[in-house]
Amino acid sequence: MKKIYDFFNYYVFGKELGVLPGSLAYSFFLAIIPILSLLFYLLSSFNLPLDMVQNFLSDTFPEGVVNLLQPIFTDTITMNSIITLVIAVMVATNGCNAIILASNTIYNIENAPIVRRTIKSLFLTIVMIILIAFVVVVPLFGKSILNILLKVFVGQEKFLTTLFLILRVPVSLVVIFTIIKLLYVVAPDQRISSKYVNRGAAFTAICWLIVTYIYSFYINNIARYDLVYGNLTNIVILLLWFYILAYVFVIGLYLNRHKTDTEIEKTNTYKLEEIRKKVQEEKHKK
């Protein structure tokens, strides 16, 4: 019981959790518009329908938040402008830089030089774009593949539809888990073994899906933030969602840190035992 209490007291309710999630949420909030703009540009380049992004937002957020983000997809964005693209990338990388700094804080690692962190932030920005693209694009492709299979295998509509519904969540979890695991491995400015981040990545991937579903239901059916925040309600809803996701992400970091510390302690204990055995053997030989 004491071990469970110590774990929650240090790793779940640690002092960093009072600061890091808020910092990450604010950075994510500032970075989400540029990231969505870059995603919009990529989708336009491949002639993919943009209504799937709007459908995702409509299914997740209330109408006010969708209207807040709507200009990103309806207004004409001239990505030929080098200045616009550079600014979008710079702002987007700030969010990923916050992930690096949060990881270094949890692992008690000294921050790398700013040039190295900037390069890593660019890479993580690409990873984040892939993650968001998967969340909003893959469901459309999944339905398209299902429609093709239904045309090929006539008479198997019920089986294929059921199989699609069963596999949709596990496949999404696996992909999101893989991307989050990559974030956990790459973000710290020190080499972290990938086998030590599985627990945190699994926890974060599952909780992100559950939290997003519950929060979406709560916002759309129960909460009345407009009574308190008025015209700022839509911004508050986004910030609160980012804060919850960031809180889960930081707890995942703590789980990885706990796993890393435990494995290092086991390794050191094993090495110490080996040294003791060798010393005893040397004494017996003498």
Q: Language-model segments: what does each one mean?
A:
Residues 1-286:
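Membrane-embedded alpha-helices and immediately adjacent juxtamembrane helical segments
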